[in-house]
Each structure stands twice: as structure tokens, then as C-alpha cells.
């Protein structure tokens, strides 16, 4: 059923469990098949076993995140039948059999929640739309049964697509508006989760910022654009957080990138590149210029050869995640894959 009925969206691994979202119907386009979270036992890392599923009122469960302590998960809702989009908070006391704590569907979230990031007692929600009432919402989840919106931010110009929070900084992938950096507790600009303060922003002409990864030790932010072909990942130098600058890029023909994961200890970035599969790139050292012309790609794989993206078959990589030395990949067409790096 996970493969035959529903397309697969994002995923998250924690401990011995993997969670995968869904992105609509394979057989009946427009139906409410993207309403399911699947739960997988990955105790045997190379042989995931489906143990449970949770259904919500949504046509798309685009994102799933697990809090670092493993006690709570959040899934996002878009296109609900009742028009009350938002999120569902899950109790992971038994991680293989999650239970619903509450569905949170405040009017502020009615356009739909596309992505989420959990940081301690706060959840950062990406609300669909390119109007001031959309953008970022910060949710206090210290009492998960009674979430409370405590802050909002809209960067103007275009819609917010994703948020990544680390070291008290929120990195907003704000499409044509660019990358926006907020202080949400770092101290660099006096911000907090309940009162975010903009630190800086950078826009790249012709580039739609889809997602970001901040690597603090290296002083870089990696940006993706899922629209333009040939696809390009940009590297932004943020050693001076108040003045980000473009440092490098990595380009591939034929498709656009989607999500990615950086193994910071090894200096390897794993880029999910839709029908082009997964590409592992050496991002160690100083990054300048066109990385694709510097022999930095160390491996790539199209694990489902043939077919096309969003089709009955064929590689259509959504997102990689490094977990216990393996690369877990969600694929729109074919579900969850487990890859072993061999370099």
C-alpha cells in the first residue's frame, strides 16, 4: 500500500524507527490519499518493516519531524476536507505505535502548513501563501495538548517554503525573496522564539530558495532551488551573519535538486536530485566557485533505473537522511530506500 496507492513525501529517522509522509494518490489523482503517516521498524537497518499508520484529514502530509529527545513528532496538513489545515502532534511513548495528542488547526494555519521544524519546546511552522498573514508561525509546544502561537514573521515578496533552526538561528527559505536569517535565541540580534529578529537576508536573481542547511563550524549555508534546470545548489558564506555572500555552487544537468543532508563530520553532502537520484559531494575545506568542475562528486546513484519522476516507476528522490552510517531516502514513486555509502 505505501508504494501502490500513495506517493511518498518526506521522512524522519530516530532510533530504530522511520516515519514517512504521503503526497497524494497514485491511481486516482486528486483523491485524499496523501493523508497518511507510515511507521517503520528499522531495527534491522536494511529491512524496514511497516508497523503502523496514522491517517489525518489532509490531501498532503508533506513533512514529518521528530523532536531530538524522541518523545514527540509533528506532521503537517495541507488541503484538508474541512478547511482546517494545520498540524497533528504525536506522542512517541511507543515510537512504533504513535498516538495522537491533538490536531492543531488555528485560523492562522488555514492556508496549510507545508513544513515544520521542532526545537525544544517550540515548533516553527511554514504557512502556505504569499501574503502577510502567511509565512512563519512559532508555536509553544511545552504543553503539547494545548499548543499556542507565540510569534509570526513574513519576509515579503514571495511565499516561505521551509525553515531550518540551529544554534538559536532560523534560516528561512523564502523563495524569490531569498534566504532570511532570524535570531530566535542566538543573541546576535537580541531575538527569541517568542520575538524573532531579522539578522540579514540575501537574494540571488533567478533563484527560488526551496530549502537550506546551516553548517556552523564551516560558516556555510547550502541552498536548493527545486525549479530551475539545470539544477543548482548554492553555498552561502555566513561567517559574518550580518552580511551573507554567495561563495560557490554545484550544478547538474537534467533535473533540479530537492532536499539534502550534510554529514559534517565527513565533509560530505548528500543531495537528493529528483530523477537524477542521490549525489554525494565533497564539501570539505574552503568552498569557492563551481564545485561541479572541481572533481568533488564522490558518488551518485539512480537506484530505480527507468521510468520518470511522479510515475509508476523510476527514481524520484525526495530527501536523504544520514542515520547510523546509512542513507535513508524517501522516493516519491517507490517509498523508503536504504543506501550504504561505500566510499
Where are these regions (language model features)?
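Feature marking well-ordered beta-strand scaffolds used for ligand recognition
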Residues: 1-343
Amino acid at each position: 500500500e505505501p508504494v501502490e496507492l500513495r506517493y511518498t513525501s518526506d521522512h524522519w529517522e530516530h532510533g530504530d524507527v522511520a516515519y514517512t509522509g504521503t503526497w497524494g494518490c497514485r491511481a486516482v489523482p486528486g483523491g485524499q490519499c496523501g493523508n497518511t503517516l507510515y511507521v517503520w521498524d528499522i531495527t534491522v537497518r536494511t529491512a524496514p518493516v511497516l508497523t503502523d499508520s496514522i491517517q489525518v484529514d489532509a490531501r498532503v502530509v508533506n513533512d514529518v519531524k521528530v523532536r531530538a529527545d524522541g518523545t514527540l513528532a509533528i506532521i503537517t496538513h495541507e488541503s484538508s476536507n474541512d478547511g482546517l489545515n494545520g498540524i497533528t502532534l504525536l506522542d512517541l511513548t511507543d515510537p512504533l505505535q504513535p498516538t495522537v495528542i491533538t490536531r492543531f488547526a488555528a485560523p492562522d494555519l488555514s492556508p496549510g502548513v507545508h513544513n515544520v521544524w521542532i526545537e525544544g519546546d517550540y515548533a516553527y511552522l511554514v504557512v502556505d501563501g504569499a501574503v502577510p498573514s502567511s509565512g512563519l508561525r512559532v508555536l509553544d509546544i511545552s504543553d503539547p495538548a494545548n499548543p499556542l502561537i507565540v510569534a509570526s514573521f513574513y519576509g515579503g515578496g514571495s511565499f516561505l517554503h521551509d525553515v531550518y533552526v540551529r544554534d538559536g538561528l532560523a534560516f528561512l527559505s523564502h523563495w524569490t525573496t531569498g534566504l532570511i536569517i532570524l535570531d530566535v535565541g542566538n543573541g546576535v540580534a537580541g531575538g527569541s522564539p517568542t520575538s524573532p529578529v531579522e539578522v540579514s537576508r540575501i537574494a540571488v536573481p533567478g533563484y527560488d530558495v526551496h530549502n537550506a542547511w546551516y553548517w556552523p563550524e564551516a560558516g556555510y549555508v547550502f541552498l536548493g532551488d527545486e525549479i530551475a534546470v539545470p539544477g543548482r545548489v548554492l553555498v552561502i558564506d555566513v561567517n559574518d551573519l550580518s552580511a551573507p555572500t554567495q561563495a560557490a555552487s554545484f550544478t547538474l544537468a537534467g533535473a533540479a535538486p530537492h532536499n539534502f543532508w550534510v554529514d559534517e563530520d565527513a565533509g560530505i553532502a548528500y543531495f537528493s536530485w529528483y530523477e537524477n537520484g542521490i549525489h554525494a559531494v565533497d564539501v570539505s575545506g574552503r568552498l569557492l566557485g563551481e564545485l561541479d568542475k572541481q572533481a568533488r562528486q564522490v558518488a551518485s546513484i539512480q537506484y530505480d533505473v527507468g521510468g520518470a519522476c511522479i510515475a509508476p516507476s523510476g527514481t524520484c528522490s525526495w530527501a536523504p537522511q544520514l542515520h547510523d552510517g546509512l542513507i535513508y531516502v524517501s522516493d516519491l514513486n517507490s517509498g523508503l530506500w536504504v543506501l550504504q555509502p561505500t566510499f
